């Protein structure tokens, strides 16, 4: 695993092709192969199995009361209890933070589980570190998106498997749209006017999309307790999304460049919240705020 810093973001799309493909399934398969027990739902790896009790899993003494077999290594579980809330956050924010816990019957064995977990996550492209905070809390946080979850769309939209004729005709399914009749041919001038209108609409849509990406990125960082590496990774992904917006419009190009620069500032190690960014841009009381923020 390598981290690229101070890179011209025009080349991010190329470099991202050489990074490991992230998929939670790969992480937990390897954990299982190393002898670590998993109390996770294998359809998503983002919630515990139906028969697992979080209150028992997160406490060593409580767990050992119910688990009679000797623990060879240890076990892993998640603190997430609402899979649909997690899916919704991914749909709205393009990603989400999920917390996993780990334990064993001794501190040394628990540390081995944690180190193995971090190592495998890093190998599969997830940004996290083995720190004293992780060791003390026995909690590992990672940023995920829909590509990390097996069968994400299937899990989130089970109603797609149960459509009836009434659903189809009443257009209850949001993925099904009625096809309008083909319009009559129009004059050349009318077509030109329509093209200009479409160009303006397209411009506004792209400007709105860029604004939405910037606002959601800053809000997401403010809302979640992320490490500096995770902030850098998340901002980099959003910059890749911005760079993928294809346009020849000069206004859109300028706005895209400005938005990318803003997100580059957010991902700087010294900028930890949206207020940091605002003060940095305004050059007002920046140093004092940074001392408090850090």
UniProtKB/Swiss-Prot annotation:
Gene Ontology molecular functions: protein-folding chaperone binding
Residue span of region Disordered: 181-204
InterPro entries associated with the record: BAG_dom_sf (IPR036533), BAG_domain (IPR003103)
Biased composition (Basic and acidic residues): 190-204
Protein name: Uncharacterized protein 391R
UniProt similarity note: Belongs to the IIV-6 391R family.
Highest taxon listed in the record's lineage: Viruses
